[in-house]
Structure formats: structure tokens, C-alpha cells
Amino acid sequence: MGELLKRADAYTLSRTRKLPDELFTFMAENGFFGMQIAKEYGGNPMSTQAKSCIMAKVSSHSGLLSAMVVIPNSLGAAELLGHYGTDEQKQYYLPKLASGEFIPGFGLTEPTAGSDAASIKAEGEVFKDSDGEIKFKLNFRKRYITLAPVSNLISLAVRLHDPENLLGKGEDAGITEVLLEKGLDGLHIGDHHQPIGEHFPNGPIVGRDVIVPASNVLGGEEYTGMGWKMLMEALAGGRMVSLPATGICGIRHGAMIAGAYSMVRQQFGIPVGRMEGVEHKIGKAAGMTYAFDAARVFGCSAVDKGIQPPVTSAIMKAYSTEMGRDT
């Protein structure tokens, strides 16, 4: 970790909005993309607690660097494949995700859906081609997809319609996770956006009549319509790991800088940090840092024990990021 931060110049990353090739290679060779991938697939598996600590440390250095560590190791293809992927999918995708050959994007958020995942409007129509193979025709507009501009593997949440009941699950097959590789006809990955003024890769993904075989369903055809379950389980854990880590990092960083400056800045011959009004504010910030970090440890420990705490995760996501912003 220390060597990574030494090599990563935060100013250069912010100015160029690009991760240098040599830094990307260093991260791949040292397991930064495989923290939730099993060793048998070339990963570097860690506990939820350990991942959270690493994400917090990286987030204190650079938004771009944070996104490159957080997304591959929280929400996205690696976690879902590890839980639900077929043996063939695991053998094909996971080693390439661990090595950085595949950079994942999590295709959930839309203009009218995000945390409200059930409201997605992305559609897929099930049909048989001239050879009798079952395929999907996908149309969708996704936005605010972190890493999208540099991604080459998208795990896409889409609502499937099966008018001929080819999959045997009724006309409305339900929300399904489909794997898309960059380069498919009709798939357009948009330019770099800055929705909150930060410099990490973020942008839209649009699909117009994108054709993929049914085998691209994450988990295989049997998991058609199981996307809602996958998303809720992934979000429950992911919300506890990544966003609280980055939010609490902001709280801690703000408290540290304010506390240090209050002891350097002097008025009336003493540091302003010795004045009661300033002391109160610095003390409150330090107390909030301690409380939020304790909640993070509690939540991550629960996930490590196999508990998926959706309510706790949602609370942590909301309040830690708000406090990090305000600090």
C-alpha cells in the first residue's frame, strides 16, 4: 500500500484523469484488482474489514486511484461471478478481472433508477435466431456508471421480456444480470463525466439493439430473472464496504487537517486550537470520526460473518457520505 501511494502522484492523476500504465501494472501485479477473487482464479482474497481499510487509505490520496480500487473490489462482476457464476464463466472472467485485463463497470443506474433498482427501464427481448439459438436484444440507457469510460466488461441489469416463453419463466422473465464485453455492435460507452466535480472515470453506457446469447446471463440461463436477488445481496455488502470507507476517510481527513491547522494558527499569542469554541468543534469532529469508524468495523465484521445487513448498510452509506461531504 505504501509503495502504491508513493508511486501515485495525486496532482498528476487529477490533472490528466488517467492512470499511468506503469501504475496500473503495479496494481495488477500486487493484487489490487483481485481482493475478492479466490486464489484459484489468480485473486488476492481479503476480508471485508481489510478491503475497507485499504479503500479508505487509497481514498485519502486520490479520487481516481480510489475508483480503480473500489469498483473492482465491491459492486460488480467479480463479486457476482464469485457467488453466482457458472464454472465456465468463473474460469473465463475471474482470472482476467484479477489481472486487470478486464476492467468492470456496474450497469445499474439510469435516469430514473439507481438505489431504487426495481425501477430500471433497460429492456431485453428474448428471441430465437435463424439457427434456433436463444438470444437477447438489449436496449438501455445507463448513466453515472463509475469506471465506464475505461471499462471493457459491463454487468448490466436489464428487465427481460419473453413473449414466446422460450426460457420457461413466463412473458415477464424479470430483472436479469447480463455480461457485456466492449466492442459489441450497438454498445456505446460514453465520454468522461464529472457528476460531482471529481476526476475519477464516470460516464454513460447506451445500448441499441445489442444482441447477446442467453449464455451471457450471469450464472447461466437458470439465473434468468434472479437479478433483483443478486443486486440486493451485492448492494447490502457493497454499501457497507466501499462508500462508508471513502466517506469516513473524508471525515478523518478533515478532522486531521483542521486539528493540525488549529495548533499552527495563532491569535492572541496562543494556538486557536486552545480556544474553547474551536476546541469544541475539533472535539466534535474527532468524536464523529471515532463513532463512524466504529460503525464501519461493526458492519464489515457482520459481512465477514456471512450476514448481509441491508438496513445497516443503507444507513452507513447515507450518513457516512453526507458527513464526509460536510466535513
Regions found by a protein language model. Name each.
Residues 62-79, 98-113, 141-154, 203:
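FAD-binding core of FAD-dependent oxidoreductases
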Residues 239-306:
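Extended amphipathic alpha-helical segments enriched in small hydrophobics
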Residues 1-72, 85-103, 115, 130-136, ...:
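Amphipathic, small/basic residue-rich leader segments at the start of a protein or domain
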Residues 92-96, 108-127, 143-144, 165:
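Beta-sandwich/jelly-roll carbohydrate-recognition scaffolds of carbohydrate-active enzymes
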Residues 307-327:
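Charged, glycine-rich active-site and insertion segments that engage polyanionic ligands
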Residues 206-239, 256-273, 297:
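A glycine-rich, basic-preceded beta-loop-alpha segment at the flavin cofactor/substrate interface
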Residues 185-211:
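Flexible, small-/acidic-enriched active-site or ligand-binding loops
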Residues 133-187:
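A short core secondary-structure module
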